[in-house]
Amino acid sequence: MKDLLKFLKAQTKTEEFDAIKIALASPDMIRSWSFGEVKKPETINYRTFKPERDGLFCARIFGPVKDYECLCGKYKRLKHRGVICEKCGVEVTQTKVRRERMGHIELASPTAHIWFLKSLPSRIGLLLDMPLRDIERVLYFESYVVIEGGMTNLERQQILTEEQYLDALEEFGDEFDAKMGAEAIQALLKSMDLEQECEQLREELNETNSETKRKKLTKRIKLLEAFVQSGNKPEWMILTVLPVLPPDLRPLVPLDGGRFATSDLNDLYRRVINRNNRLKRLLDLAAPDIIVRNEKRMLQEAVDALLDNGRRGRAITGSNKRPLKSLADMIKGKQGRFRQNLLGKRVDYSGRSVITVGPYLRLHQCGLPKKMALELFKPFIYGKLELRGLATTIKAAKKMVEREEAVVWDILDEVIREHPVLLNRAPTLHRLGIQAFEPVLIEGKAIQLHPLVCAAYNADFDGDQMAVHVPLTLEAQLEARALMMSTNNILSPANGEPIIVPSQDVVLGLYYMTRDCVNAKGEGMVLTGPKEAERLYRSGLASLHARVKVRITEYEKDANGELVAKTSLKDTTVGRAILWMIVPKGLPYSIVNQALGKKAISKMLNTCYRILGLKPTVIFADQIMYTGFAYAARSGASVGIDDMVIPEKKHEIISEAEAEVAEIQEQFQSGLVTAGERYNKVIDIWAAANDRVSKAMMDNLQTETVINRDGQEEKQVSFNSIYMMADSGARGSAAQIRQLAGMRGLMAKPDGSIIETPITANFREGLNVLQYFISTHGARKGLADTALKTANSGYLTRRLVDVAQDLVVTEDDCGTHEGIMMTPVIEGGDVKEPLRDRVLGRVTAEDVLKPGTADILVPRNTLLHEQWCDLLEENSVDAVKVRSVVSCDTDFGVCAHCYGRDLARGHIINKGEAIGVIAAQSIGEPGTQLTMRTFHIGGAASRAAAESSIQVKNKGSIKLSNVKSVVNSSGKLVITSRNTELKLIDEFGRTKESYKVPYGAVLAKGDGEQVAGGETVANWDPHTMPVITEVSGFVRFTDMIDGQTITRQTDELTGLSSLVVLDSAERTAGGKDLRPALKIVDAQGNDVLIPGTDMPAQYFLPGKAIVQLEDGVQISSGDTLARIPQESGGTKDITGGLPRVADLFEARRPKEPAILAEISGIVSFGKETKGKRRLVITPVDGSDPYEEMIPKWRQLNVFEGERVERGDVISDGPEAPHDILRLRGVHAVTRYIVNEVQDVYRLQGVKINDKHIEVIVRQMLRKATIVNAGSSDFLEGEQVEYSRVKIANRELEANGKVGATYSRDLLGITKASLATESFISAASFQETTRVLTEAAVAGKRDELRGLKENVIVGRLIPAGTGYAYHQDRMRRRAAGEAPAAPQVTAEDASASLAELLNAGLGGSDNE
């Protein structure tokens, strides 16, 4: 019995490991894996179909073909286990060893491993410091390489051609050693002394100054050190033994008709073996050198093709002209091992079918067809049948189920009760794409889905299919019930708002039910309560819309959370009173006492969840749905062609527009306007006409005139079906109704320009042929766009998930005081996002003080929930510093306080939550709703861009921030600073509006003054940039020489003359070095100093500046000295939508980025070159000045002698995120990326919480470059994981040593994914070959920290419910305990053994 137990133990053994290391395999290692050498290229015998001995499928090397049976048939059965047959040499064991036993081929000549040769940068090339071309010429036998120079003048590693080699031989004889082929490279690698080489390189590194050399040296040092530390030997990159894959992983299967299907690898191996055997024979025969050389080259090519076909030269093709799939192709790409089999597997116990509506289901139920349920729950049914004694064996149970006996259905009912199933709809874009439901057995073959979960699945019933999965184990069922049940996923993880929101019919039903109508039947009655209202409605005595008074009892929570009743008479309608019956206690009546649209219903559910919690909300949602369906049916809302009412004014408006267009056409023909102006004007006219038509149409649809009780006419909101659908938010929008009943309007050509004749017809009137033809482009483009968008959006999601997959909440509080300042998002005159929406669910980083006092309003480390936010709003706080994942100090992962509220649950986040994946899904899921296009700014839009004044909308007081200004002669303020902001503060101290004020703007009101709504507070000339004097005095020209640096121009119309400064390109040789400037002097001719400095007021003028003053005139501060014409920005395309989001997350540099000041100091201009200006910034403290060359065509925002701060904009343009990080720090770049991404999503009306974007930014910032190594082991200029630097520095500081200094790096998401510490994760993402090559050479360890790595090695993930398992494992490892192995008792063992033997004896068990 003991050995039986041993045998079973061997089978249940689980491998415990903490990390996976990858390294180069030495020849001895390859031989130790191998079970024998493959000597022949044969596969199987064509007659017997048995594997050939010593061939690629040899049973002696790889194991038996049949379980427990040797090849010749001498030994069969279990009792001979482990015997090696003396006749055929095959060990008697299970067949599955053919999946794990490897063989090997002894190569007659060494060959280079193509990955280390050709995958850039070439590792062999870097190690030997030889160019790749030279190494290839040596390897493929074109030239010689010197291995030992000896006493000759030949250098080691010198390349010799055939002729040079022969000459050298004649000259030196045997003094030197030169070879060709892989042997040569192997000899060079063998003779390297890595440590000595390292020392030498480090010395060199200290001596050199050139940047390129330093980079190259650092690369080599890193590679050499990696070799030294990992214990890899460089010569192992040259193969002398080739491992052979186990045969069952490269199968040869007989097809019917006597042909065979084989894996491509077999062909590739055959080539290698053939060439290798031929080479051996040639060497034994001592064949001529040239033949041997050719054979060696062919062997090298064969091995290359086996390892990575097509990497060098042309890919080897099979019989059908398609390239053969090599080992490298097996693991990379979507069809490779990683993505096809390790990360995505097919699932047993699953089925799929079409979905239909289940309007009578409860929220936690789904309808499952009986047929499907029977198939999916088979094992449970068999078990129950056997348990009840209804079937003696599993086989009998199987028969019963196949016959579908009556008792089977009863058992099925029992099995299914309380056993949730998972429903999934592809594409699963976020975690709500898989939810758990309790199955309800139904007839038919379609799965029934609850209508309210359609939004989460993005499902509709036009033929969508869904998959069903059965959680088998108890843990899985528990997880499904507790975490994945649809009732537990009411809120969306992306924004924390309800996702179980009624739509379409339900919304229409509720809207119809809560509308009121003038003079409806039963108006003016007073009812005792909702019950009576329903009775009257049902008996036809009152209309649903009748305005009545009803006695309503409301329940409100008091301070202790007890419900208190309050009864009063309310003015309402019958329908609203009936709806009140389903509203849970604790909500105010006011929430149903309005016409309920989709937004109102969503708000109602949200309020219910926040006040009453989960269970009442779920019940309420269900009730809303049933009621909505019922009343939608009763409403009888239908759409007829007469519902699309065309306004009478339409004809008139269109003829007016046509008249205007004709007029402009005449002006154009008489030459008063240019072609471009005419086009823009025509388009403006038609756009305006379209708006007028649609306004007339909406006014017409919106209201109808009725007779009230007193017999007078009264207007009321219309009951037109189309209008009701749009108004309630059930379906359709104003823009769509406009096309039905207004006019279709302007259409675009395929090149994006707008066609100037619009479609004046609408769909009700019908389009004529020309109009229909014009419409086709837009319609088709829409379809093509959608297909592209889906692919792009999916790829963006994949990159986001990959970069963030290992970010998990790992501790409660990291204790940091860092955080980011949150202010409301204000653009121009309106608040885009109020502060409460931004800080809700975040944790405060500092105490929030009551404005104007030192009282603490909210203490530090408070989770801001709804009540706290109300408090902040009451006290009109407009900036709060909150914790953020970007500033979290946790080493691997983040802490719960820095993340804040779990949006989908409404409380602070739990440890182990996979926030990275949630963030990636939340950003990626709405990707398909974003647009794909870059917007061309056409006519109307580009003119609006040149603003020239600020007009406030509300009344309040003005607040200016970072402002420098002077008062001009008329007493107005003139701005002389660059990034001034003007805010409008209301009487509560809240910021209502915010504007940027440019340099040179004249303010009508000063700081702190009161303004009325609609008042203009600042204006400026948008087309020129002024030069403004800060002092008063007299103008003195310097270097302004007519004809050399300036030229005088006279305006024909006004007769005024002005001076124009010449660009340096237009000046004569004498004027090149002159610097035209205006100096301000006092009456005595002395320099006037700029206030607060000791610098004379002197204003240098750039080229093209226009001066309208004469020498010596008197001026006062705030006057304009000169104007610099601004070239209008022209029509720059705005990249919008998905491409913009991708650009931001990939941290791509914009084409012409803004130029920012690298240091703070005084600006001056140095010597110019042909196309560039030299900008010099001299720091005030006298340290080294900073110089930068700027192209001449860039417009500068600064003048000579002006002071700039580090990070200020010197030349306008889109800012590059890397510059923002370098000059303004981590928080600034976070704010920039978050705001830019949010702008794109906000435009589409998609809400995403900021913290998701911050999570991705944290991952983009996870690398740092070492600036100064201090006492650490890092290299200068090396890029290291930020957490590694932090840990190393903490250790160094604890020992009183100097830590390393570093600068944070911003990586794009693709780069960041590939630069992750885990090579398994990186390899499964992209560029598999490169990642694995790099990892192998460095001998990397993968600590299996992320989710992906653990999925790949087949473990629970260290997040969610797997988090505890991993924590426990870590604890055990630390304590040195043995892991809890599955225990096997003797009884179990003998039982399972008996079963095993039965299986072996019983023959075929599967009739």
UniProtKB/Swiss-Prot annotation:
List, alphabetically, the GO terms of the cellular component aspect. Answer: cytoplasm; cytosol; cytosolic DNA-directed RNA polymerase complex; membrane; transcription elongation factor complex
* Family according to the record: Belongs to the RNA polymerase beta' chain family.
Q: Is Zinc one of the keywords UniProt gives this record?
A: yes
Record EC number: 2.7.7.6
On cofactor binding, the record's note says: Binds 1 Mg(2+) ion per subunit.
Q: Which cofactor does it need?
A: Mg(2+); Zn(2+)
Phenotypic consequence of G782 to A/C:
Resistant to antibiotics salinamide A and B
> Describe its PTM?
Acetylated on several lysine residues in the presence of glucose.
| Modified-residue entries (N6-acetyllysine), positions | K983
This enzyme catalyses: RNA(n) + a ribonucleoside 5'-triphosphate = RNA(n+1) + diphosphate
Output the CDD domains linked to this UniProt entry. Answer: RNAP_beta'_C, RNAP_beta'_N
BP terms from Gene Ontology: bacterial-type flagellum assembly; bacterial-type flagellum-dependent cell motility; cell motility; cellular response to cell envelope stress; DNA-templated transcription initiation; intracellular iron ion homeostasis; nitrate assimilation; regulation of DNA-templated transcription elongation
Please tell me where Zn(2+) 1 binds in this chain. Answer: C70, C72, C85, C88
What is the protein name given in its UniProt record? DNA-directed RNA polymerase subunit beta'
Its uses in biotechnology?
Co-administration of salinamide and rifampicin or salinamide and myxopyronin suppresses the emergence of resistance to both antibiotics.
What function is annotated for this protein?
DNA-dependent RNA polymerase (RNAP) catalyzes the transcription of DNA into RNA using the four ribonucleoside triphosphates as substrates.
ATP-binding keyword on record? no
State whether it acts alone or in a complex, and with which partners, per the record: The RNAP catalytic core consists of 2 alpha, 1 beta, 1 beta' and 1 omega subunit. When a sigma factor is associated with the core the holoenzyme is formed, which can initiate transcription. The rRNA transcription and antitermination complex (rrnTAC) consists of RNAP, NusA, NusB, NusE (rpsJ), NusG, SubB, ribosomal protein S4, DNA and precursor rRNA; S4 is more flexible than other subunits.
Which parts of the sequence bind Zn(2+) 2?
Answer: C814, C888, C895, C898
The reported result of mutating F763C is:
Resistant to antibiotics salinamide A and B
Specify the domain of life of the species encoding this protein. Answer: Bacteria
Impact noted for substituting A735T: Resistant to antibiotics salinamide A and B
